[in-house]
Curated annotation (Swiss-Prot):
InterPro entries xrefs: DUF1328 (IPR009760)
Family to which the UniProt record says this protein belongs: Belongs to the UPF0391 family.
Regions crossing the membrane: 5-25, 29-48
Pfam families for the chain: DUF1328
Source superkingdom: Bacteria
A GO CC term attached to the entry: plasma membrane
Subcellular location field: Cell membrane
Keywords for the protein's UniProt record, in alphabetical order: Cell membrane, Membrane, Transmembrane, Transmembrane helix
Name of the molecule in the record: UPF0391 membrane protein BAB1_1670
Membrane topology: Multi-pass membrane protein
Organism: Brucella abortus (strain 2308)
Amino acid sequence: MLYYVLVFLVVALVAGALGFGGIAGASAGIAQILFFVFLALLVISLIASAIRKA
């Protein structure tokens, strides 16, 4: 149980450091681009799967 507390503490410290630093704005822009790229890949995969089954 103490292991999980330490892991979550480290994750929270890293998230806080990145959130309060200047990296947050750049990371948000990159995350938006990656979201739309993977959304497009999902749609292409679903269409290819539907065509393959038909």
